[in-house]
Amino acid sequence: MQEYNQPLRIGVGGPVGSGKTALLEVLCKAMRDSYQIAVVTNDIYTQEDAKILTRAQALDADRIIGVETGGCPHTAIREDASMNLAAVEELAMRHKNLDIVFVESGGDNLSATFSPELADLTIYVIDVAEGEKIPRKGGPGITHSDLLVINKIDLAPYVGASLEVMEADTAKMRPVKPYVFTNLKEKVGLETIIDFIIDKGMLRR
């Protein structure tokens, strides 16, 4: 018999270095006073992202579980999500009134998607440093995620990327789905992401 609330599960995906862990850090710090939050991270051989969040004091250590997938990170969030589902359940049992569990995928490519059994909402993170062509390359992360985060806009002048081109391409690839340009170091765009989570996740304000 289930003796805990079913939290909102938010999958956070994106290529290595795009800013997934940085996003989770700022989200947790901004939302933890209003909501009960926990995090599951995925790494192939280590628990490095979990350690980063713990060191940053994003949440108490008992609210973070690092899953070592030991293989293709896509499989652990899609075809066989059992390890992640078990981690979510463990966190929900530890903290009976959880509102949100973020599930961060291991570094993946544009074709990775979350199993609907694992994530109620999905956020996909790309970054400007990968080049302005990234949005038009498509893939499920770009086209099907519930929210697309285009991070590190401050780097655009240094990598020769046009934010105007990126926005036009993103609008073509996601004509009815939301996206946001961010600089997470300066918290630019953070409130838009929080509002999306609250509204789409039907959380209390």
Swiss-Prot record:
InterPro entries: CobW/HypB/UreG_nucleotide-bd, P-loop_NTPase, UreG
Recorded GO MF terms: GTP binding; GTPase activity; nickel cation binding
Domain of life: Bacteria
Pfam families on file: cobW (PF02492)
Keyword Phosphoprotein set for record: no
BP GO annotations: urea catabolic process
Main location: cytoplasm
GO annotation, cellular component aspect: cytoplasm
Cell compartment(s), UniProt: Cytoplasm
Keyword line: Chaperone, Cytoplasm, GTP-binding, Nickel insertion, Nucleotide-binding, Virulence
Chain residues that bind GTP: G14, P15, V16, G17, S18, G19, K20, T21
Function: Facilitates the functional incorporation of the urease nickel metallocenter. This process requires GTP hydrolysis, probably effectuated by UreG.
Record note on quaternary structure: Homodimer. UreD, UreF and UreG form a complex that acts as a GTP-hydrolysis-dependent molecular chaperone, activating the urease apoprotein by helping to assemble the nickel containing metallocenter of UreC. The UreE protein probably delivers the nickel.
Family: Belongs to the SIMIBI class G3E GTPase family. UreG subfamily.
UniProt protein name: Urease accessory protein UreG
Organism this protein belongs to: Proteus mirabilis (strain HI4320)
